[in-house]
Structures are given as structure tokens and as C-alpha cells.
Amino acid sequence: MAQATVTVDGVKVTSTRPQSAQISIHIHHKSALEQLLGAMGSLKKFLSYPQARIHYGQLSLGVTQILLGLVSCVLGVCLYFGPWTELCASGCAFWSGSVAILAGVGIVIHEMGQGKLSGHISRLLLLACSATAAAATVMGVKSLIWQTSASYYFEISSTCDSLQPSIVDRFRSVRFTDDSDWRTERCREYLRMMMNLFLAFCILFTVICILKIVVSVASLGLSLRSMCGRNSQVLNDEETEKKLLGGDSAPASPTKEKIPVTP
């Protein structure tokens, strides 16, 4: 503060002159890297659940889904060695098994990472797995009905009729022999065994498809329940934080009393 001396009626009076106040304003600009890192942190926080833990039940269902998909693909290879049916022509054993493997991998990745985006993708894959498994089940049931029909049995058994010699040859007559009958019966016996084997493959494939539907629905139910529980927990945390912030509001400033100045 600057001082000045003034003489009033022979008396020196010292007065002070107020100096001008200087206000220094410093504006800090964040760099582009800091802004990018902050945006990535906000995105990661938005796409992830807070304090998420691994559900081992869901993880085991994902591993089971992968195994069922692998078994489905192996059965698809085995079915191609049998008679040509609609089940083989459609290739449903391969595409339904591939979708099941992808759904299982999606479940495992989601449980290990606990992200919102991975959760949505895994649920979409589970829906696709259920749809493809249902379509494969319908084809498997149709193939079972056809393989157990009488027309299919006669069609397969007719391939052994070529082993029987003709009744009249061009130059001489040929009679049936016990050897030709034995070969025909042996051929039909082998064909019957092969028919039963591929029928067992078809039954096993249909059961695998039904299990894929059950596992997919169970995984989808657990995923939806976990998502609803996490969302409700986030809402409760936000409400608690709002209550705490509302309770910590600053108290009202006290009223200033006017002090009378005596002359």
C-alpha cells in the first residue's frame, strides 16, 4: 500500500492509497493425447461393468457349448459316409456346430472380459445358436422318420439283388445256387448293420442339437439375469451417490450484523 502525508491545520495526517489489484488468469489447455486418453477411459468405463466377477456356471456352459459344437461337426463327417439324405445334403451338422462353437467362445470371452459390448454379442450368438440348432433338430427328425420307413429299407436292400444270377442266359440256363443265396443274405446283413449304424449317428446328432438348444437357452437366461442385476446395482449406486452429495451441501452463510459507527 502507498502512503501519502497531508498537513491539515498544522497536523500531519498520513493516508494510504489503495493499489490496483492484479488478477492473473491462467488457462490450461489439455493436449490432444490427454484428451484421447480421457475419451478412451470414458469409453472403457461405459462399455464395462463396475466390480464384475466371473460366473463359473456361465463359463462351464460356454465350454459345454463348444464341446457340443465339435461333436456336431464330427457327426457331420460320419454322416457323409452313409446314404445320401437331406440331412447330409443340407450340411446342417457343420453350420449348426460352427455357430455353437462361436457362441461358446463368445460366452468365454465375455466372462473373462466382462464388457457390455461382448455381452451383447454373446447374447446374439446364443440366439443364433438356438435358431440353427432348432432347424437342425427338425431336419434330424425328418431323416429319422425316413430312415425307419419301409420304403427306405427296400431301397437299400435292393442293391443286393444284383448278386443273384439271371434265370436265363443267352446260351445256357443258369440255376440258383446256395452260394449266390449266401452272398445275397450276407450282403443284406452288412447293409442292415450299416443302416443301424447310421441311424444311431442320426439319433445322436438329433440329441446333440436338442442339448445345444437347452444349453443356449440356459446361458441366455443366466446372461439376462446377470445383466439386469448389474444394471440395478449401478442404479442403486448412482442413487446412493446422489443422496451423499445432497447431504454434503454447504450451510447457509450467517447474516451479517450491522455495527453502528459512533461519531
From Swiss-Prot:
The chain crosses the membrane at residues 61-81, 89-109, 125-145, 197-217. The modification Phosphoserine is found at S249, S253. Expressed in spleen by a variety of myeloid cells including macrophages and dendritic cells (at protein level). Ubiquitously expressed with higher expression in lymphoid tissues. The keyword Transmembrane helix applies. It is a multi-pass membrane protein. Its main location: nucleus. Induction: Up-regulated in tolerated allografts. Down-regulated in activated macrophages. Overexpression of Tmem176b alters maturation of bone marrow-derived dendritic cells. Belongs to the TMEM176 family. This is Transmembrane protein 176B.
